[in-house]
């Protein structure tokens, strides 16, 4: 390579970088990335303390990365390039057959998975109300055959055996989902189960409580969206897959929803359709995360009051359970601080079910409040 040509390439590269810098300076800062589903770093304030402790330069680096021109397109191009050279794991998410993204489950390292089982056991000791434990295996276990050859993911079935050692009645979500593993029971671009998966999960719960199962032919699914790109889509950088279809199965007629989002009861909604025009479409189920929510059904088939101590999987599960129970109470320990045993006693609860996806259960530090 001649010196003249080398200088030419250097000049072109410098012009390219300079152009990007000018472009970035001229562009208005974005507050969030809908593709990545997260808030972006804003321009940091220059202060003496931030310079001295080094945080200013760290914030500047994060700011430049987040506000880089065409960031969403670059991250997608990076993932596509890595796929072409044989990579199958993107930000701890596997690209699997059938345009499916599956989150790898890492082995717990801090003992929280054992501690959380202990907190559940302590709650059972504090309450005289019948209590059940339901841990939902993720797609990495149920769809293990879809993972790339040699792909690793923590053994969730072994953990279910460990959980059974508590002696509590177990809701066998694993058997219910595995029996229908050839069906779309999980979203391809999100970690949650679909309405179909939640339907099978509801019947697993009703079975262990000795209640009649729901009939699939009793529901007429409504296609709520054909453009759902979930959290795995956002986190992986794999932005070329066909979007998921989201369905609503349960009719809203006859159901009354009450939410406690700010500490006081307010009218809720079974399906908040405003989210269907946004990135986080799964939040349309019950309106997303909230400390406490109660679904009432005067025409429930069997009656009774059920308390779900739960994560977001129950947002899609609860509408089905409301077909059997007169009241379904959903308590999220991340946001609600009344001791669950006290809440159950004060509200005339007939049965308590701790329902979590396994990846959430083994990492949630808020389950300590179950032992209060």
Please report, for each region that a protein language model flagged, where it lies by residue.
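Extracellular glycan-modifying ectodomains
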Residues: 1-372
């Amino acid at each position: 390579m001649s010196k003249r040509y080398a200088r030419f390439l250097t000049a072109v590269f410098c012009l390219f970088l300079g152009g990007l810098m000018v472009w970035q300076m001229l562009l208005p800062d974005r507050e969030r990335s809908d593709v990545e589903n997260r808030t972006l770093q804003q321009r940091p304030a220059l202060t003496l303390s931030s310079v001295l402790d080094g945080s200013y330069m760290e914030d500047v680096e994060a700011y430049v990365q987040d506000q880089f021109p065409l960031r969403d397109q670059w991250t997608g191009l990076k993932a596509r390039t890595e796929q072409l050279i044989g990579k199958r794991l993107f930000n701890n998410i596997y690209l699997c057959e059938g345009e499916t993204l599956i989150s790898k489950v890492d082995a717990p390292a801090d003992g929280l998975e054992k501690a959380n089982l202990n907190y559940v056991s302590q709650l059972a000791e504090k309450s005289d109300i019948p209590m059940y434990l339901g841990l939902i295996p993720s797609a990495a276990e149920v769809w293990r055959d879809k993972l790339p050859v040699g792909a690793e993911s923590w053994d969730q079935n072994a953990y279910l055996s460990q959980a059974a050692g508590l002696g509590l009645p177990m809701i066998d979500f694993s058997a219910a989902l595995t029996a229908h593993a050839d069906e779309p029971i999980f979203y391809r671009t999100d970690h949650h189960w679909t309405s179909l998966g939640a339907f099978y999960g509801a019947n697993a719960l009703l079975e262990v409580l000795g209640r009649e199962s729901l009939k699939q032919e009793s529901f007429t699914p409504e296609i709520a969206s054909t453009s759902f790109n979930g959290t795995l889509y956002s986190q992986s950088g794999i932005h070329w897959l066909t979007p998921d279809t989201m369905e609503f199965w349960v009719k809203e007629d006859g159901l009354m929803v009450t939410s406690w989002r700010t500490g006081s009861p307010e009218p809720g909604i079974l399906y908040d359709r405003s989210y269907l025009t946004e990135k986080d479409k799964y939040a349309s189920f019950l309106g997303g995360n909230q400390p406490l929510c109660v679904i009432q059904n005067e025409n429930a088939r069997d009656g009774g009051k059920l308390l779900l101590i739960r994560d977001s999987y129950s947002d899609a599960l609860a509408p089905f359970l409301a077909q059997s129970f007169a009241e379904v109470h959903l308590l999220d320990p991340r946001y609600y601080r009344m001791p669950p045993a006290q809440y159950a006693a004060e509200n005339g609860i007939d049965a308590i079910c701790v329902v979590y996806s396994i990846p959430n259960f083994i990492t949630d530090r808020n389950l300590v409040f179950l032992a209060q």
